[in-house]
Every structure is written in structure tokens, then in C-alpha cells.
Regions:
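C-terminal PAP-associated
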Residues: 29, 34-613
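Secretory targeting and sorting signals
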Residues: 2-35
Length: 613
């Protein structure tokens, strides 16, 4: 999420500064010169060593932070992170048979409350939405990352150390480096943890965004995340059509020899979309510091249009694709407006294969080849926003109540608000996995269940093959949609064991459910079972991005993604989702706007759970 220095009830936006109860004040945007990077090979920059235990835990300043003002409510987006051009809602689709919530929790083991909005306030000194979920598990440690803090737990949920600020962890300036989109991965091959995050800079003199941004990558020195780490970065400012581009929404994948990071490139100071970007690093090379090259793989030759939301796969227990000199598989969807599709629907997925990845071994001459196949699937489309069960939403109610607003916000400007909705994503591909020769993926889609359009999930299991002539082909082994009558299923993330047992982590929210963390298991024929609740929501989400007093436009934030991780020690799947773990009334909020369980400006939490399928 975007961040600037700020005080009082102000909060920073990448597009400018908003003050509670007033209109937007456009910040000047500085665009200094910077050397071109472009496609090809470059060197990672070392940011030095780091430890989780050594991160400071102090309050630097107070404030609210989100991404861009409305972060892409209209085509052309905004000057911020987590952009999305696709308009939510207004689409209709054929009927889908709904699943049920059966009240059981098969295979559920450890399940505990993870990081929440108050951890940002206590550790970083500000609050933001949404969390953006990172999760990786190995050697009895569970590492959770969100915007913009992290925590290491034991498998029973006990904290192994302090909550840490990710700017400290990545050796970034705490005041002028803005952070977004963390993710992480534990690699059993190297017995290392890998983490990545986007950072983009503000000018130290003015606080204005200056257009410079980079991806930071951290690698643990051992299989213990509480030990030492080494931090690298590579600049992505020039990776796109503009003089200044932002490497939005970085996601991590890995195979036998490589670590892969994908981004969506947008012009930093203008409207437009520059396409997905793919970067390849030597997995062992950055772990032992023997090979710090990063290869920017061009995508234009593999697809005529602009690929969007490209998701690299990870593989449980080193079950990598070994053919064609090592292969990393990726998936992308085609319904988003960034691809040039203005209908909001599509019947194709992009299956990608980056071969020759054995050449990412330390010191080897790199010879990577990228191929793509368009795989025909059932029609899917951009989902509508998700409504939630009626309940107390004291922040929104306070903005509408003179007595509360005067006491809490020192303002007499009352504005009416109703209970907000949740973002349901934009049909971009969610977390992907390669296991037992198959690629698993899921995306958010509009579904019609019980005669009503709702947000649901489409899931895919695809077998990639390469013909004797070297042509990549994807065959759909299984596909389907998950829908829940009167409710919504959103932000799915596949977790798969080496034997192909699959769990789909997801959110459950709607007329019957406060925002909850759930999951679905699949049988051997890839048929989904009922929805199970791992962490039941106890109240509505009630965050500042739901209310135009703070944002100047309406894009309620949720997600922006969930995460799963395979635990090689137990054979289980870990999952982390956003949910709402607290509730309080307007009366309680007026007396104490934290209610002892939330922030004045929001109430999101995360749930971390273990499932053995």
C-alpha cells in the first residue's frame, strides 16, 4: 500500500493527500532521471543482511494509508499500487449449482488468529487496507507477511519473536520507502525461505512520489527464519512503455533451479498498462550469494496482446517439472480490461512454460525459452462486489452520527453511510501450484446461483505437454465453479500435496456470513466437497476504504490475495485468509474507537490454519 509521512487523521495516497472530511489535494509528482533497465540480464543490488529479531518495534507516526485514491475505479487506473481497470458488477452469467457449508472441519489442525490491523498501528505506526497475504512454512516455523508487517509462529500458533516492520526487515527507509504486496516461499531443496515485496519511493524533501521503484528479495541463511537473511533488490522503473513504470502486484514462484517473480507494469505517472513482466533468478545462486544475476524474460514474443496477472507456480516437496531442461509453468487469465478485453468475460487461459531453467544454476550460461498456449475453458468473468451480513459497522455509523463524529473525529460534517461491500478481485489468476504433472489455478468470477449474480471461484487443473515439434499444449483435466446461494466465495488459493491432494482456501461472505476464512477439499477425481469454515467472522468489515469521506471514491478494499503453503514435515497444507475477528457497537466505539479489539479506522484480521487433506 502507498505510504507517505503524515500526522493526525491524514493519510497518504499515491495520487495525492486526502484529509478527513475534505476533498483531494493533488500532490506534485517529481520525475527524476534514472538509468534504463529494460529486458535482458542485470545484477541484483545487495541491501545487506537482516534478521527478524533485530527489527525495531516503535511507532514512527500516525495515519491512514491505502493505495491510489480509488485504485482503478475507472479505466486508466490511478497513480498507485494494486491497480485494476476492470469495473465490478453489471455482468450476468448462466446459472451455477451452489455448494453448501456443512458445519464440519475435516482435516483441520492448528488454526489461530494471525496478524491484524492493530499490528500495523503498533509496529509501523499507521494503519492500511488491505493486508495482502504472504505465507510460507518449513521446519516448524510459519512465516506470515502482510502489508506492512510480519510474524513468525510455531505450528501451534505461539509467536517465536516480535512482530516486525517489513521496511526494517528489507533494510528500507522507514519514512520514504513505500511498501506493497509481500509474498514468501519455503524451498525444501535449499532449505531456505524466500520473500519478496515492492518498494516505491517518496522524495525525502517533499514527500512526493518520485517514480522510482524496485522489487526486494530476501533469502534466509538457513532453514530457520529467525536466523540471518540476505536482502537484494532490482529496479523495475524502466520495465514498461513509460519513462517511469511501477512493478505492481509482484508474485513469487520457483522450480528446481530458479526463483521467479512476476509483476504487472503500469505507467507510474500516467494512465495505461504495460503488460505483465517476468524475472528469473538463480535459486541457489542468491541463497549462497554465488550468482546474483536477474534475467528479465520478454513476453511480447510469446503473446500478441498484453499478458496480465501472470502467476508462477511453486511445487510441493521438490516435485518440479524436469522436462525440456527444467520448466517453470505459469497461468494467466484473459477477462481483465488490461488485456484489451472490454467485455469482462473470456473462455481462455494463458498457460506458459519457461523451459531451460536448469541454466539458472549458479554460474551457468542462461538459455531460457518461453512458450504459451491458449487453453479453452468454461466462460468466466469479472465478479461483482460482495455484500456482507448485516451487523454493527461503527466507523461508518460514526461518520453518520453527529455526537460520535464530533467526539471521535472533531468534525461536525455528518455524511450518511450504509454497511460497505467487499472487493471480489477482478478475475486475475490467484495462487498456482505445479504438482504431479498438473498445474492448479483458481480465479474470482461472476456466478449466478439461485437466480442471483454473486462472486464465486473458478478452478482449473491443466496438464501441460510439449509435442515432438516443440509446441506447448494444455489439456483441461478438471474445471468447475464454486458458488454459494445468497453469499459469495472469493480470493481462492490452491494448496496441493506431492500426491495431488488439493485444498482451496477462500473467503466466505454474504447475507448469511460475516467475512470468514474457509476452505474446500477435492477428491481424487478433482470433485470439490462442501465449504468448511476455519475461522468464522464475528462482524462486518468496517474499514476506511469503504467510506468516501476518506478515499474520495468508492473501491472498498479486501484481499488482495490469500496464500497457502505445503508443509513438508507434516504433509499438510497451511492457509492464510483475511477475515473479521471482532465486532463492537456504535456506543462502544464512541466511548473508545478501538473497542479494545480494532483500530479507529478498520478492523481486518487474518486467520492462519493447517489442513491435512
Amino acid at each position: 500500500m502507498a505510504r507517505h509521512r503524515t500526522t493526525n487523521v491524514r493519510y497518504a495516497l499515491a495520487a495525492g493527500l486526502i484529509v478527513l472530511g475534505s476533498g483531494a489535494v493533488q500532490a506534485s509528482l517529481t520525475a527524476p532521471a534514472i538509468a534504463a533497465s529494460g529486458s535482458g540480464e542485470r545484477q541484483l543490488v545487495s541491501r545487506g543482511t537482516s534478521t527478524i529479531a533485530g527489527s525495531t518495534t516503535v511507532t514512527r507516526h500516525g495515519g491512514l494509508f491505502t493505495g491510489a485514491q480509488v485504485e482503478g475505479d475507472v479505466a486508466g487506473g490511478g497513480k498507485g499500487v494494486n491497480r485494476s481497470f476492470s469495473t465490478r458488477g453489471g455482468r450476468h452469467t448462466a446459472g451455477t449449482t451452489g455448494v453448501t457449508v456443512d458445519g464440519t472441519t475435516p482435516g483441520l489442525g492448528s488454526s489461530f488468529a494471525g496478524l491484524d490491523i492493530t499490528d500495523n498501528a503498533k509496529t509501523a505506526g499507521f494503519v492500511l487496507e488491505p493486508p495482502d497475504q504472504g505465507l510460507c512454512v518449513g521446519n516448524g516455523s510459519v512465516l506470515e507477511l502482510v502489508n506492512v508487517v510480519g510474524q513468525v509462529y510455531g505450528t501451534g500458533g505461539a509467536k517465536k519473536g516480535p512482530t516486525f516492520y517489513l521496511n526494517d526487515f528489507f533494510n528500507e527507509d522507514p519514512n520514504f520507502a513505500n511498501a506493497s504486496d509481500p509474498s514468501c516461499y519455503y524451498d525444501a531443496d535449499t532449505n531456505r525461505f524466500y520473500a519478496d515485496m515492492l518498494f516505491y519511493d517518496s522524495d525525502p524533501k517533499t514527500g512526493d512520489l518520485n517514480g522510482q521503484n524496485r522489487i526486494d528479495v530476501a533469502v534466509s541463511d538457513s532453514g530457520d527464519p529467525m536466523g540471518g537473511w540476505h536482502v537484494y533488490s532490482f529496479d523495475v522503473t524502466k520495465d514498461g512503455p513509460s519513462a517511469f513504470n511501477i512493478g505492481d502486484y509482484p508474485q513469487i514462484g520457483a522450480d528446481s533451479q530458479g526463483v521467479y517473480i512476476t509483476t504487472n507494469s503500469y505507467p507510474f505517472f500516467e494512465n495505461g498498462f504495460g503488460g505483465a513482466q517476468l524475472y528469473a533468478l538463480s535459486k541457489r545462486g542468491i541463497a549462497n550469494r554465488s550468482d546474483t544475476r536477474v534475467t528479465h524474460v520478454p513476453l511480447s514474443s510469446a503473446q500478441g496482446g498484453k499478458p496480465f496477472g501472470l502467476r508462477p507456480t511453486t511445487s510441493p516437496a521438490a516435485g518440479y517439472a524436469r522436462e525440456n531442461g527444467g520448466t517453470e509453468h505459469l497461468l494467466s487469465s484473459q477477462a481483465g480490461e488490461e488485456t484489451g478485453n472490454h467485455q469482462g468475460f473470456d473462455q481462455g487461459l494463458g498457460l506458459w512454460a519457461l523451459s531451460g531453467t536448469d541454466s539458472l544454476a549458479p554460474g551457468a550460461s542462461r538459455a531460457l525459452t518461453l512458450k504459451r498456449d491458449s487453453v479453452t475453458v468454461d466462460r468466466y468473468g469479472v465478479p461483482p462486489l460482495s455484500e456482507q451480513k448485516a451487523g454493527d459497522y461503527p466507523l461508518g455509523q460514526c461518520l453518520s452520527d453527529l455526537a460520535c463524529r464530533t467526539k471521535v473525529f472533531k468534525s461536525t460534517k455528518v455524511s450518511p453511510h450504509v454497511e460497505g461491500q467487499l472487493d471480489s478481485s477482478d478475475s486475475r489468476m490467484n495462487q498456482t501450484v505445479y504438482a504431479k504433472g498438473l498445474v492448479y489455478g483458481t480465479l474470482d468470477t461472476v456466478v449466478n446461483v439461485g437466480g442471483q449474480d454473486r462472486a464465486g471461484l473458478a478452478y482449473y487443473v491443466i496438464r501441460p505437454t510439449t509435442t515432438a515439434g516443440g509446441v506447448l499444449q494444455g489439456t483441461v483435466v478438471a474445471q468447475g465453479k464454486l458458488a454459494l446461494a445468497g453469499n459469495n466465495l472469493t480470493f481462492g488459493a490452491f494448496g496441493v500435496t506431492p500426491t495431488g491432494k488439493a485444498v482451496l482456501a477462500l473467503n466466505v461472505v454474504g447475507s448469511s456470513y460475516y467475512p470468514s476464512a474457509g476452505y474446500v477439499t477435492f477428491d481424487a477425481a478433482f470433485h470439490p466437497g462442501a465449504v468448511h469454515i476455519a475461522g468464522a467472522g464475528v462482524g462486518p468489515t468496517d474499514g476506511f476504504t469503504e467510506y468516501t469521506d476518506f478515499t474520495g471514491g468508492y473501491r472498498p478494499r479486501w484481499g488482495d490475495y490469500a496464500a497457502t503453503a505445503y508443509d513438508p514435515a507434516t504433509g499438510s497444507i497451511w492457509m492464510a485468509n483475511e477475515y473479521i475477528a471482532q465486532s463492537c457497537s456504535l456506543t462502544q466505539y464512541t466511548a473508545d474507537p478501538t473497542c479494545g479489539t480494532r483500530s479507529r479506522y478498520g478492523n481486518w484480521s487474518t486467520r492462519v490454519s493447517q489442513v491435512t487433506p
